[in-house]
Amino acid sequence: MSPAEALASLVVEPGYRIDLVAAEPLVQSPVAIAFDERGRMYVAENRGYPDPLEGGPAAAPQGVIALVTDTDGDGHYDRRSDFATGLTYPNGVMAWDGGVFVTVAPDLLYLKDTNGDGVADQRRVVLTGFNTNRTAQIRFSHPTLGPDGWIYMTAGLNGGRVTSPAHPERRPVEFTSSDSRFNPRTGEFELVGGQGQFGLTFDDQGRRFICANRNPVWHVVLEPPQLKRNPNLAFSETVQEVSAAGAQAKVWPISRDLTTASFIPTMMNAPHVGTFTAASGVHIHRGDALPDGQRGSVFIAESAQNLVQRQLLESDGVSFRSRPARDGVEFLASRDTWFRPVFLANGPDGALYIVDMYRKDIDHPAYVPEPSRRLFDFTAGSSRGRIYRIAASGRAPVRSPVDFAAASVEVLVATLEQPNGWRRDTAQRLLIERNAQAAAGQLRSLSAAGNEFGRLHALWTMDALDVLRDDDIVRAMRDRIASVRENGVRLAERRLPQSPQLFDALIPLANDTDARVRLHVALALGAVDDPRNIDVLATIARRDGADRWLRAAVLSSVRNRASAFLDAFVAGPGAAPAVRGAVMQDLGRLFGAAESAEQCLAIVTHISAPVAELSWQPAALAGLAAGLRTRGIASNAQSALMTLVSADTVQARVARERLATLMVRAGQLALRQGAPAEQRLSAIELLGQGEWSASGNTLVRLLEPQREAVIQIAAVRAIGQLRETQAAASLVEPARWQAYTPQVRDAVLTVVLSEERLVSVLLDAVASRGISASALGASRWRRLTAHRNPAIRQRAEALYNAEETGTAMQVYQRKLPDVLAHTGDPARGAAPFTRYCVACHTFNGTGGVVGPDLSGIRNQPADALLLHIVFPDYEITPGYEAYTVQIGDGRTIVGRLESEAPNSVTLRDGTGQSHAIVRTDIKSMTAATSSLMPAGLDQTMSSGELADLIAYLKSAAR
């Protein structure tokens, strides 16, 4: 479409207006933008995208950094210069000190125009060594100035061996996939939490968010150095999944575009259409030109489905949750399948800017099966591109020129209070670039008396300028605004070892009303190895121990004082049972990993002492067992915990006797329906550290379909921990397997395939037909047929080949040439679809819901579609297996498992009717080994009719 036609095809949420501010030929293949202090826009143009199919560098680097300007102030850019050319795949740009940083792997470049002609005459490699061994869309990107004056970048799911040409004396930083940051003034480079793909943003309070293709919003909660203080802490997570992800991350496109997954035969039962498959450019809007109340909204671009989603961000403990602002309809969507939003930004005018790469296809050819590549033109649109501006409708756009280049220090400091986030960030950047230490007095006044924005920016600017004083931080930690206290604690962390004043001011904040403040107090205490920390950390743990982030922060800061922490934790006011159990489990893991055998035996004896009611004890022992496992003391016949208590000493004998008694009680707790779920789960985990002879019967009972799925899955994992062969065999016993729901089956397969000693048990079950070969799915068969153990590999190959040459496969292979020889007619194919398929399957919005929606398979090769018609059991979509449930009133219900809850399951029968069944009413539940789709449908149709049906299913394809 022309730029005007493309603009007309956009549908934006009511209350907003959208304007086209730049289009080809002014911009081409834009993927990122940045505004400098004069309001000029730098555009990273990735014209050479995608890289060659065979990998390696592009034949001729085509990337450009364009400098575009609005010369007449009408809000539309009208002049361009090629600021820098000959770049491979530039994918990020950020203004700094009169020039720009550009991410163009393997290098981070600095480009600057020193003579004012609009062309960079200075080009310097700041950092180098970022990997280029993966496709162009999986490389480091998004240079973004953080509140601390460092520039943050996403990993692009990639790594490198990064060095600084200006500082050859510095050691290389090697990593496989981690986000990073560098100091633009010193060139220091270090890794940070998160593994973002193509998207990085900060909120007004300085918190960092990233994204990946199937993960629209992640919040970076912790940083790796904060977790390294305690080497025995088994916690490595740094990000919280804020939004729904994967198949749950819904989008509502108005176009009919394709996703790469639609072309992969092994994914035909799990199409990505209707879910985020290319989330990028995650952006928290901090401008003032959107409708009132929209500050802090999260925007995510979805280029594969031609839309931008707006989500609402809500606090969730120390982190956040988000949800689509409108269910069923997007913030911005286009009917034009070439609309490819990839990057979002705050503008100088407070508006939201959207970068549209505008391509026919946006993907890498290596991700598309070879037979389907001919349907794509990966370079079509490389000379096009559009940039849009969105603001509140009915509000006059800001037209005042922006030029902070000559602004005085006084003006810049005053700007730190403005509601426009871009202006605040730019003012802070300029103060840092100028090393404006003379502004310390003004900044100090602002940090004490400004609004929230001003206080936060002033604090971090003083820190970057090295003029921040301890009393500034103390004042911030006592501020009435929670976010100011939070940032005050963050600033205090690295100063604590040298500042008793800060330490004393920090202690009362252990009882702060804000969870994020308490989180950072716990983290800050880890910066100083002081025994006084322990009581404070115990206070936080008793209040917040159920939160995994706060628990990890506390235990990281405990360092090597686990015994002292245990004493302080149990000596204080009683914590809630759930809190006590969670803390004691992780604390037990620390003891098991680090303490001597004698100390661990003493803990087993103490915890296993007789009590009236079990609550936290199983959790603590399960944690201890997990810690012991890391020491490699388990034998082929015994778990690490049982090995510990089997020593030939009086201490071990006492511990063993007490543990045996507690194990019996743990089994009773696990079976008790009304007991708290977390206590039952801990008890089940502990049973998995015992012996099959003592725990097996209880764990098998927990696999019954009457039990909640979460209980069944916990039992599966526990059985997988037991060392005896009969334990694993119990998981794949045919009658039991048939009763499992898909969720439980998946857990069984995951557990059995996780240990080499258990794989043979699974292969035995497949060989005896107790488990259908198709139940494993293609990906698991690929793992087995590539197994490192030759015996397993050869046996798996034999079983898989037997399945591939069975009767149904022979029928398929016989029919395939004849069907493909016909030219199918989509119009004629509607009749067999209506006759045989529509009752169970939806296609293009019409049909039943018993089977999978077929709308997403229209791009599959004809041979793959024929395979599923002739051989419906070849691959059964998880969730569409047939189940037979006998219930207490004598009825038998057959259908697919539509959903399951802790206390019930719902089946949808062949007529489309749903049946909700309380688990306690289930007498038996059995899964069929075959698909709900009847075999032999191909026998009712001629080869020509099959070709017509396939053509109909593919009728919406390009």
Segments the model singles out, each with a brief description of its role:
Residues 1-411, 422, 430-433, 502-503, ...:
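Beta-propeller domains with acidic blade repeats across secreted/periplasmic ectodomains
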Residues 21, 41, 98-100, 105-106, ...:
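C-terminal capping alpha-helices of c-type cytochrome domains
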Residues 119, 159-164, 186-188, 317-318, ...:
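Inter-heme linker and motif-flanking segments adjacent to c-type heme-binding CXXCH motifs
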Residues 130, 286, 312, 391, ...:
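Sec/Tat-exported extracytoplasmic proteins
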Residues 154, 192, 203, 211, ...:
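Generic beta-strand/beta-sheet core signal
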